[in-house]
Structures are given as C-alpha cells and as structure tokens.
C-alpha cells in the first residue's frame, strides 16, 4: 500500500513533460523571439505549446503555435502557463545544442522550468507575467503573397542598405517593394511567386522589423504575407503543416502625421 501511494503522488507532482528531437528548430524560433521581446508566457495546453508576446513599443506581435504532434512526447497532466525571460531560455538552448531536449514543470517547484538533454540538466527561474493571450480574428485582405522565404529575405537585405521604411504597393497587377534613403532608392517587383491581388494597396513598414521576421527563413521554406490597407501586416511561417505549427508576426503599418513625418 505504501508503494502504491508514493507512486501515485509522484505522478501527480508532474504538471507536464514534453520531449523534442528538434532542438535546433526550437532554438531558432526563440532566437527570433529574443530579437523582438524580452519576456513571454509559455502556454502548455492539450493542443500544444503556444507563445504570444508584443514588443515593448507595441508595434509588433509574435504568435507561436507548436502542435502537440510536433513533439516526440507531449504529456500534460494539467494545462499550465509559465512566464520566462526569453534571453535566458535561448542561453540554455545554446548549451543544449542540437540534442533531444525534455522540458518539464512540477507542482512542487512552480518557480522553476526544467530543461534536460542527454548529458545536461538546467533549471530556469520562472517569472509572473500578467497578460492574457489575444484572440486574433480573421480579416479581409487586399494582397496575399505566398513566397519562397529566402527570396523575401534576400529582397529585404538588399533594401536594408537603402532605407529604414519599406513601402509595399500594387501597380498594374504587380506587387512592388520600395525604399529610399540618402544614397538613392530601390524598387523591386515580387515575381515568380504566388500573388493574389484583391484590391489596391499602399502600406509602409519599418525595415528593421521586416528584417527580423525574415530570419524565420531558417525555419520555414515559405512565407505567407497578408496585407490590407491601414491594417497590421501578417507574416506567417509554417514549419510543420501536419501539426499546424507556425510562427506569425503582426506588424503595425507606419502612418503619416500632420507634419508628414512617419510614425506608428
């Protein structure tokens, strides 16, 4: 009787345990997160892991969804939300390397997230973050671009040397990306990619944010860009379609104030 009771209690103390054999991808995802936000809640649910956070300027929102089937093992005794400092998590993932990793959280140590690899054990302090996950509604779009993520990243790298604002606009059934600065300007046509134009579009975004989003090209071969005049742009990278796992970025467009200076 004593042995049965002890075993039962041990099971109950484990809130969740997940195992991933794709540590490199997990690290790349959180490296991109780290470029935008400092802290975030990890939400472990019966459907999978989700992470959502907004940058301190409230200009961009990052939304990560990893379906449970993406993991080698995904065991949830109770759904939980754990707040972490992203840079600390990335530091641990750097130490783990590309090995299989196990992430767990227990009732008796609610202030620690446990990360294990074959030869290393880490305990990371958790933090309390008072925020609720936002529901993101479906929206109409003027332009949809389904493109090779490396091509889009190349476009943005070329444009980053010219200006700090990228203008995306439609003209004669073609989508253009344009920027200008002290040394001149560049206007690129998006070609040889799947493009759907449903309405006229002119919007401007900060180059530095787009460059950060484009780092997700190391995770997904494709990027889907959804644009609507005067609305946040959506940049979506699906890295595992079978489990519906993806990282999405939402970016507020730049607007003109009365003095014709660009601002958010």
From Swiss-Prot:
Protein name: Probable DNA polymerase sliding clamp 2
GO biological process: leading strand elongation; mismatch repair; regulation of DNA replication; translesion synthesis
InterPro entries cross-referenced by the UniProt entry: DNA_clamp_sf, Pr_cel_nuc_antig, Pr_cel_nuc_antig_C, Pr_cel_nuc_antig_CS, Pr_cel_nuc_antig_N
Function of the protein: Sliding clamp subunit. Responsible for tethering the catalytic subunit of DNA polymerase to DNA during high-speed replication.
UniProt keywords, alphabetically: DNA replication, DNA-binding
Family annotation (SUPFAM superfamilies): DNA clamp (SSF55979)
Keyword DNA-binding: yes
Domain of life: Viruses
The organism of origin for this protein: Paramecium bursaria Chlorella virus 1 (PBCV-1)
Pfam families: PCNA_C, PCNA_N
PROSITE patterns: PCNA_1
Similarity remark: Belongs to the PCNA family.
UniProt GO molecular function: DNA binding; DNA polymerase processivity factor activity
Keyword set includes Transport: no
